[in-house]
Amino acid sequence: METKNKNKLIIYTFFGFFLLVGFITYDDYGVSIEEHTQLYSGVYWLNYIVNFFEIDFLKERVLQNLNSFAYYSDLPDPRIYNYYGPIFDVPTALIDVIFNIQKTSLYFQYRHFIVFLFFYLSSIVFFHLLLKRFDNFLISFFGTAMYIFSPRIYGDSFHNNKDIILLSFVVFSIFFAFKIFEKIKIKKILLFSLFAAIATSTRVMGLFLPISLIIFLYLEKLNDKSTSNIKYILLAIFSYLLFLFLHWPYLWESPISSFIEFISKS
């Protein structure tokens, strides 16, 4: 019991200090050209959503933000590079509109902090994932420290709103995949499918998540001769595709052809 309390104190202190450092230093990082591209993409898709659902009270303000990018002629046109996932870019573009953010530096500073928060949450989940896998506090603690303080990952965790978001949702997905194999429940499959769908729209590599789960569920079915896994496989496929479609405007008009195009372009 004493060891358990000591371990809790260590991990709470560690994650508390990590959060404090992130809060103090998130605005110390520069801005890459890709961040401007994602900013443009977010406003473009927000404008699409606002018009698709006829949200009249936002139309003018969103269009004003979109038109401001006419000055950035060197940025990739989101009408052509229209397959970037929306999970980070669209909500932050909506924040810009709602709070009428005009200061350019603030655009990126709060985005850096949100990217860090995603990574911070993923590091907590990663610790619990290792704890489930190894059932050893020291291995889990040092494994998490390596995950966090890998120089490239740590630096990117404040500004890379594609790869860090992907990494975070991969961790979330794998955590729930482990939970599924502990004891299959519909809620776990739905959460896995949601996170895997977001990972896929962020980067095409996220496709390996549902494919891997389906393969392992099928292998488990062969091992125990049970037919129950078939319904869970079908649920995983259906819910994954549904979440992919629902959260990704790129797929709304022609889901199949757009998804094939996404794979071919990536």
Placement of each model-derived feature along the sequence:
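Short acidic/glycine- and proline-prone juxtamembrane loop motifs at membrane-interface regions
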Residues: 32, 158-165
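Specific aromatic-rich, kink-prone transmembrane helix
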Residues: 125, 129, 165-182, 191-196
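Transmembrane-helix signature of polytopic, membrane-embedded enzymes
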Residues: 12, 124-149, 182, 186-187, ...
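Transmembrane-helix motifs of polytopic, lipid-linked glycan transferases
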Residues: 109, 113-134, 172, 176
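Transmembrane signal-anchor helices characteristic of membrane glycosylation enzymes that use polyprenol
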Residues: 7-35, 43-73, 146, 199, ...
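Short helix- or helix-capping micro-motifs
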Residues: 140-148, 175, 196, 200
